[in-house]
Amino acid sequence: MRPIYLDNNATTRVDAEVLQAMLPFFADVFGNASSMHDAGATAGAAINVARRQLQALIGAKFDPEITFTSGGTESNNAAILSGLEAMPERTEIVTSAVEHPAVLTLCTHLEKTRGTKVHKVPVDHQGRLDLDAYQDALTHRVAIVSIMWANNETGTIFPVVKLAEMAKKVGAIFHTDAVQAIGKLPIDLKSTAIDMLSLSAHKFHGPKGVGALYIKRGVPFHALIKGGHQERDRRAGTENTPGIVGLGKAAELALDCMDKDNAIIRSFRDRLEKGLLERVPQVFVMGDPVTRLPNTTSIAFEGVGGEAMQFLLNRHGIACSSGSACTSRSLSTSHVLKAMGTPHRQAVGAVRFSLSGYNCEEDIDRVLRVIPAVVKKLRESRPVFAG
C-alpha cells in the first residue's frame, strides 16, 4: 500500500533535483565559505548562487538583503528581537492571535521578562484579521509588527502588503512570517513596504535546518547570534553550504513550477473537500474559503476527536495533522481555532490536510474511500463532544 502524505504544511519531501544539487557539498566541495583558499571560494560562490536564486523567488531588490539562517524559528526570533533593539524608545509589539508558536512564545517571553506590551490582534470566524483592531493597535509606541503571510493550520492568507503600509505610517518595522507562503504564493518584495520576511527551506521541498531572513536595505538590524562575520555580520557561524545550496535549488524549482503545480494541487484540494462534504455528515471547512493557500484545507469532523482520526488514518497509510492536542486529562483545541471562535465540538475534530505536487488523483480517491468509514467508526464508539 503506497503511503499518502497529506501533511506538507509540517514538512515536505526533498525534491530529487535539490538532493542532487546538495550532494557534492558534503564531501567533494567541503570548504568553509569564509576561507580564502580555492575550496572556500568555491563554497562561497555556491552560497552566492543560492542567494540569487532565492532573491528571484521572493522578488528582493538586492541579493545582500538575504541572510541565511537555520530556519523559520530563528528568523522570526532574530527579526522581532532586532526590531526591539533597533527602536529602544518603543516598547510595544503588534502581532496576531493566530501566529506560529515561534512568534507567540517569544512574545510571551518578552512580556514576562522585559515588560514588553504585546497587542494580539483578533481574527474573525474564518481566521481573517480584524483590520480595525489592527489599526487601533498601531501607535508610535510600536517598535515592530509581526504578522504571518498565511496561516499554517487553516491556510488563510493575510493582506500583509496592506498591513505593512499601515505600519509604515507610524514608523514601525514590519516583519512577516512567510514560512507557509513561500513556494505557494507569488511574492515580489521590492514592490512592498515589508521590512523583514522569514522562510524555511523544508516547507518548499528543500532540506531541513536551513532558512533565511530577508532584511530590506536600510532597515536597522542587530544580529541575534554573535561570533564571526558571516552573512555580512548578521548571522555568525560557519554557513551550512549543502543546506543553503539545497534551499537555492528548491527556490529555483518553486519559481519555475509554482503556477502549474498550484493549479493541479488546488483542484485536488477542492475535490477532497467536495467529496468529504458530500460523503460525511456534520463536516465543516475551517478558515477563509477563498483567500487561502491552494494546498491547505482544515476540516472539522463533528463528534470525533482529531487525534483519534489522525491515528486511524495513519493505520491506513494516510498522513495528516490533527488540530487538537490530546492529553490523558483533557482534550484541548488549537490556539488558532480558539481565536476563530470555533465551537469546541467542532474544533476537537479538526484535521488539516496539506497537499503537494507529489500527490495524485489516486491519493484523493483513496482518502475519500477511507475517511467515511473511519468517521462512522469513531462516532459509533465515542460520545459527541459537548462544547
UniProtKB/Swiss-Prot annotation:
EC number: 2.8.1.7
Described function: Catalyzes the removal of elemental sulfur atoms from cysteine to produce alanine. Seems to participate in the biosynthesis of the nitrogenase metalloclusters by providing the inorganic sulfur required for the Fe-S core formation.
GO MF annotation terms: cysteine desulfurase activity; iron-sulfur cluster binding; metal ion binding; pyridoxal phosphate binding
Membrane-crossing residue ranges in chain numbering: none
Matching InterPro entries: Aminotrans_V_dom, Aminotrans_V_PyrdxlP_BS, Cys_deSase_NifS_bac/arc, Cysteine_dSase, PyrdxlP-dep_Trfase, PyrdxlP-dep_Trfase_major, PyrdxlP-dep_Trfase_small
Residues annotated as binding pyridoxal 5'-phosphate: G72, T73, N152, Q180, S200, A201, H202, T238
Complexes and interactors: Homodimer.
Binding site residues for [2Fe-2S] cluster: C326
Cofactor annotation: pyridoxal 5'-phosphate
Organism: Sinorhizobium fredii (strain NBRC 101917 / NGR234)
Protein name: Cysteine desulfurase
One of the protein's GO biological processes: nitrogen fixation
Active site, renumbered: C326 (cysteine persulfide intermediate)
Gene, per the UniProt record: nifS
Alphabetized UniProt keyword annotations: Iron, Iron-sulfur, Metal-binding, Nitrogen fixation, Plasmid, Pyridoxal phosphate, Transferase
